[in-house]
Regions:
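A short linear hydrophobic-aromatic micro-motif
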Residues: 132, 262-266, 297-302
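A generic structural signal for secondary-structure junctions
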Residues: 88, 114, 213, 231-234, ...
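ABC transporter nucleotide-binding domains
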Residues: 10-15, 20-216, 220-222
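Pre-NBD coupling/linker segments of ABC/ABC-like ATPases
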Residues: 1-9
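Alpha-helix N-cap/helix-start and coil->helix boundary motif
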Residues: 19, 103-106, 202, 227, ...
Length: 317
């Protein structure tokens, strides 16, 4: 891999023309992707869109039909055990030895890596504290809730201090409390580890990810920063909530606004007005003076932004 350009973040994950076909069926169409180091990257798609296939190819757990992938500068699409030192992986349905305690399980995993006993003990303590399981270190894993098991799964994936962490649908089977705890944990890793998070749950991606890729039927539709994505698909709609004491004055205001050349449409429901504008600069300059001119008191003035769900539904039609 070449050196990153000055002023850009180094790439933690990269792939070129990565694909997977089963006969004529494309599980993943040729994919070119770059994920900056230290970011939380959200890989969003419906069930069956190709998210798990992509992760398996990026981690070397499946062989691609074509293309190559690198994690932390080491190619993963060749049979090279060095690459597995560079990432941690939590599959969608992780398996545990239910008769073990979390300490026993993490020690079992840590023995796969070059750590002596003292190093393993220290790292296990660090991981249990990080994922909030220190108080449960003597309990059997079989008695853990789903959220506790997923947090233990992240601990085992990070036990060897990898620079990259792959999480495949980590919250899909959790209740709301478990999801909240796990998302807080994932968010806390930002800047320390590069996280590649696949999910079909839009709220989770929107909450913790700073960069988002959307995949549909094995094809990557786009990659963008979360805020950039929301801005790119923004609708030019202003919501005005007028004080109810001013309702008798509202009709005259609405009638005048409808005549403005920058107005594409207007709806009014009780004391809330939504104005669809064609020229945002003109609207910003003119609306507030019009409110003052008509003696209206304003409770709320808001440029509406689409939700990630609305963007996703638009793109995945």
């Amino acid at each position: 891999m070449g050196s990153p350009a000055a002023g850009t973040k180094p790439e933690a994950i990269r792939c070129q023309h990565l694909s997977k076909y089963y006969g004529d069926v494309a599980a993943l169409k040729p994919l070119d992707l770059s994920v900056p180091a230290g970011s939380v990257f959200g890989f969003l798609g419906r069930n069956g869109a190709g998210k798990t296939t992509t992760i398996r190819l990026l981690t070397g757990l499946a062989r691609p039909t074509s293309g190559s992938a690198w994690v932390d500068g080491v190619e993963t699409t060749r049979a090279d055990s060095r690459a597995r030192q560079n990432f941690g992986y939590l599959p969608q349905d992780p398996a545990f030895y239910n008769w073990m305690t979390p300490v026993e399980f993490l020690d079992y995993i840590a023995r796969l890596f070059p750590m002596n006993r003292a190093q393993r003990r220290q790292r296990i303590e660090e991981m249990l504290s990080l994922v909030g399981l220190k108080d449960a270190e003597t309990r059997r894993i079989g008695g853990f809730s789903g959220g506790m098991q997923q947090r233990l799964g992240i601990a085992q994936a990070l036990i060897h201090r990898p620079p990259v962490l792959f999480l495949d649908e980590p919250t899909s089977s959790l209740d709301p409390a478990g999801r909240y705890e796990l998302l807080d944990l994932i968010s806390s890793l930002r800047g320390q580890v590069t996280v590649f998070l696949s999910s079909h749950i839009l709220a989770d991606i929107e909450r913790v990810c700073d960069t988002i890729g959307i995949i549909r039927e094995g094809e990557l539709l786009l990659v963008a920063g979360r805020d950039e994505l929301l801005s790119r698909y923004a609708t030019n709609v202003i919501a005005l909530e007028i004080d109810r004491d001013c309702l008798p004055l509202l009709n005259a205001f609405v009638a005048q606004v409808e005549t403005q050349p920058w107005v594409a449409g207007l709806t009014a429901a009780n004391n809330v007005i939504r104005v669809n504008v064609t020229d945002t600069a003109a609207a910003r300059q003119a609306l507030l003076p019009l409110l003052v001119q008509h003696g209206l008191l304003l409770n709320r003035y808001e440029w509406l932004r689409p939700t990630l769900e609305e963007i996703f539904l638009t793109l995945s039609q």
